Amino acid sequence: MAYVSMKQMLETGVHFGHQTRRWNPKMRPFIFGARNGIHIIDLQQTVKMFRVAHDKVVDTVANGGRVMFIGTKRQAQEAVATEAGRAGQFYVTNRWMGGTLTNFFTIQKSIDRLKKLEAMFADGTVNRYQKKEILRLQREMDKLLATLGGIKDMDKLPQLAFVIDPHREDIAIKECRKLGIPIVAVTDTNCDPDLIDFVIPGNDDAIRAIKLFVAAIADACLEGDALRKERKGQDAEEELKKASEPKAAEAAAE
């Protein structure tokens, strides 16, 4: 079980919040003080709260749930796509399409269209069209891939959302809350922590800080998946043992 240490947080600037004039007073309990007009986040709390969030992620995946990583700001896009992909989880990095969760049936139609276009290019069907039409289809596929590529294999809603900058991702937060999907979020000093189920007080702007948290949550997903597989193997062994017991009893009776 790998948690993020305070040393790692200090090295990546997790403790630097926003300018004091841009704060949300609800974040007061998580602020250590201010320096040169910048709020300093209390990392002792961040360390503890990250552990709670980490364990929630592990437990969710261990029980067969899926996590959606959400981070559309420029600093987060690469890390979110890379780490969510490594962990085999869903992600959104380009822009949040309204209704991605609350109107998933409609979004699914766009996903089906994306898969159809990918199949056409993969098997050469697209070559039946004229060059101009092929270029149009390529642009359509690229646009859909940029928006939906991270959720194209999502056949049901995620059981947990992990968000970088809930202030920016306000529409995604509203959809999760409406559907009762628990939210883990890296929450800077300008955010409303009341909207988040598992708050991780921290810098949501610095690339190194973002990478630290995103990689750690991806590791938590992988840890949960390993536990799920281990339990599944144990259950299979137990079933096999139960199935063999009657046969052993019959053999003994003979």
UniProtKB/Swiss-Prot annotation:
Gene3D superfamilies: Glucose-6-phosphate isomerase like protein, domain 1 (3.40.50.10490), Helix hairpin bin (1.10.287.610). GO terms for molecular function: structural constituent of ribosome. The keyword Zinc-finger does not apply. Residues 228-254 are annotated as: Disordered. Keywords: Ribonucleoprotein, Ribosomal protein. PROSITE patterns: RIBOSOMAL_S2_1. This is Small ribosomal subunit protein uS2. One of its GO terms (biological process) is translation.
